[in-house]
From Swiss-Prot:
ATPase required for the post-translational delivery of tail-anchored (TA) proteins to the endoplasmic reticulum. Recognizes and selectively binds the transmembrane domain of TA proteins in the cytosol. This complex then targets to the endoplasmic reticulum by membrane-bound receptors, where the tail-anchored protein is released for insertion. This process is regulated by ATP binding and hydrolysis. ATP binding drives the homodimer towards the closed dimer state, facilitating recognition of newly synthesized TA membrane proteins. ATP hydrolysis is required for insertion. Zn(2+) binds at C283, C286. GO terms for biological process: cellular response to oxidative stress; pheromone-dependent signal transduction involved in conjugation with cellular fusion; post-translational protein targeting to endoplasmic reticulum membrane; response to heat; response to metal ion; retrograde vesicle-mediated transport, Golgi to endoplasmic reticulum; tail-anchored membrane protein insertion into ER membrane. ATP binds at K32, G33, G34, V35, G36, K37, T38, T39, E245, N272. It comes from Pyricularia oryzae (strain 70-15 / ATCC MYA-4617 / FGSC 8958). One of its GO terms (molecular function) is ATP hydrolysis activity. This is ATPase GET3.
């Protein structure tokens, strides 16, 4: 009997519950590197677009695989995905977001250097990047800027590998520390900075120090509001993606424990790249790998008996392009049935 079949009493082995939960506003998809996070997030976005007014898919992974998945170039501005009328995507560069904040939009770097200001901008940037997790925090700040100007019903995050994802979720406290540090420096070295900046007291981007502080304070208030939403299970959930191997299972357990410490809801796990050897198969390698996968699948079902555990098969070709993603996405809501289960 195939291990892909689940007892009737178990949680439904699909992500249908996410589609049915109309109140969800924020959905994170994350896990260890190389387990199929991007494929899963793209596929979930496609399914959500069928039942939501508007969906935004965002990559916060520096690798930025959304463009490869949909065979379409995306950038830091939300853009409709070809073939859809209500599904958009964007890829955010955390470093670029920070540089925009510090250097200012459209700042003339050559002119700044000529005025002796370039060094000041570099110092501020070095100071900012010295704060742990600030790159992820600014990545989210860029997201908020987009989301506030465009009203999306649901936002899906294709996150960076596990460690970065968990740091990303600490951004409110990170920005609190950043603001405290800047305030401290401003009060301690304000006169010195004003003397260095000249009579107008302007930073390289043309802003004054108080203006920059005011913008950061507004950003902090917005992020605090969103952080409250993140801890509301009616508005936010996290989908864990893994494969049936020891390291991936270990990372998933660590991530679930840490999400719980942040009070962030998670009740769905997608297990990718599962082998389902055909009856009579003579592939010893396939059988051995299947036995290993079964061992870890059994552990997943035992550990997470109150989760929706979705089991996705290993495919013979890459899942790239709209048509293949749509086909893959169907298996997220309609459990995959191995060929031998039909007999």
């Amino acid at each position: 009997m195939s291990t892909a079949l689940i007892d009737v009493d178990s949680m439904e082995p699909s992500l249908q519950s996410i589609l049915d939960q109309k109140s969800l506003r924020w959905i994170f998809v994350g896990g260890k590197g190389g387990v199929g996070k991007t494929t899963t997030s793209c596929s979930l976005a496609i399914q959500l677009a069928k039942v939501r007014r508007s969906v935004l898919l965002i990559s916060t992974d520096p690798a930025h695989n959304l463009s490869d998945a949909f065979s379409q170039k995306f950038g830091k501005e939300a853009r409709l995905i070809d073939g859809f009328t209500n599904l958009s995507a964007m890829e955010i560069d955390p470093n670029g977001s920070m540089q925009d904040l510090l250097a200012g939009q459209g700042a003339d770097e050559g002119g700044a250097a000529a005025d002796g200001m370039a060094g000041m901008g570099g110092m501020m940037q070095d100071l900012a990047f010295a704060i742990p997790g600030i790159d992820e925090a600014m990545s989210f700040a860029e997201v908020l800027k987009q989301v506030k100007s465009l009203s999306y019903e649901t936002i899906i995050f294709d996150t960076a590998p596990t460690g970065h994802t968990l740091r990303f979720l600490q951004f409110p406290s990170v920005l609190e520390k950043a603001l405290a540090k800047v305030s401290q420096l401003s009060s301690q070295y304000g006169p010195l900075l004003n003397g260095f900046l000249g009579g107008q007291g302007q930073l390289p981007n043309g802003q004054s120090l108080p203006e920059m502080m005011e913008k950061l304070e507004q950003l902090r208030e917005t992020i605090s509001e969103v952080n409250t939403q993140f801890k509301d299970e009616n508005l936010t959930t996290f989908v864990c993606v893994c494969i049936a191997e020891f390291l991936s299972l270990y990372e998933t357990e660590r991530m679930i424990q840490e999400l719980a410490s942040y009070n962030i809801d998670t009740h769905c796990i997608v297990v990718n790249q599962l082998l389902f050897p055909k009856k009579g198969s003579k592939c010893d390698h396939c059988d051995a790998r299947r036995r290993m996968q079964k061992k870890y699948l059994d552990q997943i079902e035992e550990l997470y008996d109150e989760f929706n555990v979705v089991k996705m098969p290993m495919l013979i070709e890459e899942v790239r392009g709209k048509e293949k993603l749509e086909k893959f996405s169907e298996m997220l809501v309609k459990p995959y049935v191995p060929p031998e289960a039909d007999e």
